[in-house]
Amino acid sequence: MYKFETHLHTSNCSACAVSSGYDMVDAAKEKGYSGFVVTNHFYHGNTCVDRNLSWESFIAAYCEDYEITRDYGEKMGIQVFFGIEEGFAPGKEMLIYGISPEILTAHPEFIMFGAKEKAEFIHRMGGVTVCAHPFRSRSYIPNPDKEPDISLFDGIEGYNYCNAPEENEKALAFAKKNGLFATSGGDVHNSKNFGNAGIEFETQIKD
């Protein structure tokens, strides 16, 4: 079996992360994972990247830590894939998979899109959208019990290591009720917490 973490942040790109990409690769190796997806906070999230940069420079800076992590992963036998976590409302975030840095660079209008436009764009580009940590109850999140708009998402993060058990139970039930696939993510910010979630595949994945 091939195990992958689906939700992970690195400290040089996500302001809330503690560990570097190097530490994350080492942790993946130690815990017996095949790889992970780097889903750093994007433009409308808790990013370290200067939003005053030109769009092209912003994307280059945003992707730099992913690229460093990917290259180190190759040396260590750990696959590292590119993803995004983008905010679309207070405390509400979208995990995006299957979109390349080149696509982002070519579409500066992406930062102006609302949630629906973002989802439609991702789908046109062949990507996948997943609702991150639904039903999460935090002081900064208004209406935590509000159900996700299923028109925006292909899947739901049914298990998030940082969510309470009852929040994950609601997420899984929501995914099942609405015919959406469910993912499992560690929402890893510290390499010490690597290994508490993920998805297993029977065959090696390429992208």
Which residues does each PLM region occupy?
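Extended substrate/RNA-proximal surfaces in nucleic-acid metabolism proteins
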Residues: 42-157, 162-163, 205
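Active-site flanking residues adjacent to catalytic metal/cofactor-binding acidic residues
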Residues: 6, 39, 84, 132, ...
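A short helix->loop->beta-strand "cap" motif at the edges of active sites that frequently abuts
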Residues: 33, 78, 178-180
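Catalytic domains of carbohydrate-active enzymes, especially glycoside hydrolases
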Residues: 23-39
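Ser/Thr-glycine-rich phosphate-binding loops at phosphate-binding pockets of nucleotides
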Residues: 10-11, 35-47
